[in-house]
A protein has these predicted regions:
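Acidic (Asp/Glu)-rich catalytic clusters
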Residues: 2, 27-35, 55-77, 93-94, ...
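Acidic/histidine-rich catalytic cores of soluble enzymes
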Residues: 3-7, 11-12, 22, 38-39, ...
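The substrate-binding groove and active-site-proximal loops of carbohydrate-active enzymes
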Residues: 15, 49-55, 105-114, 159, ...
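Short, acidic/polar
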Residues: 18-31, 115-125, 223-233, 281-284
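Active-site acidic/histidine proton-transfer and metal-coordination neighborhood
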Residues: 25, 29-30, 69-70, 85-213, ...
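Short beta-strand segments at enzyme active-site cores
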Residues: 39-42, 75-80, 132-140, 182-186, ...
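C-terminal helical cap(s) of enzyme catalytic domains, especially alpha/beta-barrels
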Residues: 308-331, 335
Length: 350
């Protein structure tokens, strides 16, 4: 068994217009002051990273890495959630997702897809230059609108959808394979990879590509009413990233999983700060330790009630309290009889 690394924090939800949240150095120092030792960096925000420069210059990447570490934290992984989303967008969603892309590309959906693909490929090179082993992204979605089978899905639609999704991602996956970096898809509603079955469909469609991995976030599984602990039993060989994010699901006679188009505060399924929801993190950390998870425990804060600064402050200690120091001996070693071949034969009656 291995010791999990952490605590770390995903910076995306904390970037803002005022200090210390408006520059990468300031926010890293802030994170370190709270007890975090790692930061996960969103590559869509130019205040956080010059992705192209880090990808194309090992010298600059070393300088950038040194700057982050001088603030008291390490880079855990990079993220291309926004860019990954744009790798696969259903045409009916083009308008609503256009704000994710640079202004010059809005309305030019073919160019937007090419830009997104290039961005994620750059992240592979940047991750390699920074010495990182895993990367976070979204799969995008072509089939999500058919997740509820009404009207009835035509035969072959799902296979065709995953075939096209794999076609778009395989060149990117090849770039990650070449870089020696795992590409971890966050299993997430609104993405075509939103549960274990859809992950398996995608993996098969890519020909079991070795770079296809999982970012595990139990909060999304609570909101789907999926068994998030058994998910670890099924998919632990693929889980290379972990978001510590809590959630609660309190259905009523009025609303359930779909949420009734309500705001987050009123939805039966809501994201919460760690410890305020229903996720059994003690069991999660135990299972991750049992399965030799080698990555980081990264706080992702998305709570509809608590202030983010309070969530960040409490989150560092929450992760520390759940991290397990792996034992180096069996609890009953004191009663060990040692190794005795003759005794073993006697016990076996042979």
């Amino acid at each position: 068994m291995k010791n999990i690394k952490g605590p770390a924090i995903f910076l995306a939800q904390f970037m803002g217009d005022k200090p210390p949240f408006n520059s990468i150095e300031a926010i890293c120092k802030w994170a370190a002051s709270l007890g975090y030792i790692g930061v996960q960096i969103p590559t869509i925000d130019p205040r956080c990273i010059d992705l192209k420069k880090v990808a194309e210059s090992k010298t600059y990447a070393d300088e950038y890495k040194g700057t982050i570490e001088s603030c008291g934290v390490k880079i855990t992984e990079l993220s291309t959630h926004i860019q990954g989303q744009l790798v696969a967008v259903h045409e009916s969603d083009n308008f609503i997702f256009d704000n994710f892309a640079p202004k010059k590309l809005r309305g030019n959906y073919k160019a937007r897809t090419a830009w997104a693909t290039d961005q994620v490929k750059l992240a592979a090179k940047a991750s390699k230059n920074l010495g990182l082993k895993a990367h976070a992204t979204f799969s995008g979605a072509l089939l999500w609108k058919t997740v509820y089978p009404w009207p009835q899905r035509p035969l072959g639609l799902v296979d065709a959808g995953f075939k096209e999704l794999a076609k778009r991602w395989i060149p990117i996956l090849n770039a990650f394979d070449k870089a020696g970096v795992d590409l971890c898809y966050e299993i997430h509603p609104s993405e075509d990879l939103h549960d274990g079955v859809t992950f398996e469909r995608f993996l098969k469609a890519t020909g079991n590509h070795p770079s296809v991995k999982i970012l595990y976030d139990p909060s999304h599984q609570v909101l789907q009413q999926l068994d998030y602990l058994q998910f670890l039993d099924f998919y632990h060989p693929y889980i290379k990233m972990f978001h510590v994010k809590d959630a609660e699901f309190n259905p009523s006679g009025k609303s359930g999983v779909y949420g009734g188009y309500q705001d987050w505060i009123d939805r039966p399924g809501r994201f919460r700060s760690p410890g305020d929801g229903q996720v059994d993190f003690k069991s999660i950390f135990s299972k991750l330790a049992q399965y030799d998870y080698l990555g980081w425990a990264v706080l992702e804060w998305e709570c509809c009630i608590k202030h983010p600064e309070q969530g960040a402050r409490e989150g560092a200690q929450f992760i520390k309290d759940h991290m397990i120091r792996i034992t180096d001996k069996a609890f009953d070693d004191f009663a060990s009889a040692g190794t005795d071949a003759k005794l073993n034969r006697k016990i076996l009656g042979i």
